[in-house]
Amino acid sequence: MRARLPLNALRAFEASARYLNFTKAGLELHVSQAAVSQQVRTLEQMLGVALFTRVPRGLQLTDEGMHLLPSITEALQMMSSAMDKFHEGKIKEVLTIAVVGTFAIGWLLPRITAFLNENPWIDIRILTHNNVVNLAAEGIDASIRFGTGGWINTENILLFQAPHTVLCSPETSKKLYIPSDLKKVCLLRSYRKEEWNNWFKAAGIDPWTITGPIFDSTRLMIDAVKLGDYAALVPYHMFQKELNERSVAKPFEIYATLGGYWLTLQKSRVNHNSEALNVFKEWIIEHSREFVLKS
C-alpha cells in the first residue's frame, strides 16, 4: 500500500525552500513559524535526511533538499492545475479563438470581460493573426476573419459588414477638403490591392497610382497616420475610440464596403462543437447584432 503523503509537510518544505525563511513561509501558508518548522522537521524524519541547514540570515538547502525540491514543486503545481480545471462543480473548458488584430482590439477585447463574467468556466485563449489561419492544423476552435466569407472547409457566419473610409491625423485632415486632395499626402496600403480603387469609385473620382508602404496590420497603419502626412483606408468602426479621443480624424463621409467580419468554424466540427464554443458562438452573434443596431 502506498504510504500516505504528508501534504502539509510537503507544502511547508516547498514554501520554505522558495523563501529560505520559515517565518515568510508561514505567512504564505497562514500558519506560525513554529508550525512550519515542525512540518519540515516531520518530513526530514520521514526521509531520514536534513533538507535545510540553518544559517545566520535564514535557511540554506542541503544537497538532498535541492534534489527533492523540483519534484515537489512540479507535483504541487500539477495538483493546483487540476483543481483550477473546476469552477463551481463544472469542469473548465479551454476555448482557443484566433482573431484578426483589428477586430480583437477594436471590438472583442472591450466586451470579452462581460463574456467571461457570465461564463467563468470557460478558459479562453485569444490568438491574433493577419487573416491567414488554419483552424485544424493550429488547434484553433474558431476564428474571426475579415473578408467576403469564401474560405473553404469552414462554416462562415457573417457578424457584420465593415465599411472602410479614410482616417488621418487631425492636422492632416485640415488640408483635405475634397477627395482628390488625398494626392497631397502619402496613402498607406494593405495587402488587399483594390481597396483604394474601390474607395475612389465610391468617391466618384478617377484613381491614381499609390506608392505608399504596404502594411500587414491595420492597427499599425493607424499608429503611422498619427505621425505625419499619411492617410489610411480602414474599417472606421474599429477605431471609434481613437475618433472619440480625436487622436485621428475622418475627413470624408464616403464609405466603401470591402468585406465584413466573419466567425469561421471547421465544417467537420459544426455538429460536434464543445459546449464552450457553442456558448461563445451564440454570444458573439447576439452582440454583433446589437452592435449593428446601435451603429
Swiss-Prot record:
Disulfide bonds: none annotated. Residues 22-41 bind DNA. GO terms for molecular function: DNA-binding transcription factor activity; sequence-specific DNA binding. Gene3D superfamilies: Periplasmic binding protein-like II, Winged helix-like DNA-binding domain superfamily/Winged helix DNA-binding domain. It comes from the Bacteria. SUPFAM superfamilies: Periplasmic binding protein-like II, Winged helix' DNA-binding domain. Keywords: Activator, DNA-binding, Transcription, Transcription regulation. GO terms for biological process: DNA-templated transcription. Residues 5-62 form the HTH lysR-type domain. Pfam families: HTH_1 (PF00126), LysR_substrate (PF03466). Coiled coil: none annotated. This protein is a positive regulator of gene expression of carbapenem-hydrolyzing beta-lactamase (NmcA). Belongs to the LysR transcriptional regulatory family. This is Carbapenem-hydrolyzing beta-lactamase transcriptional activator.
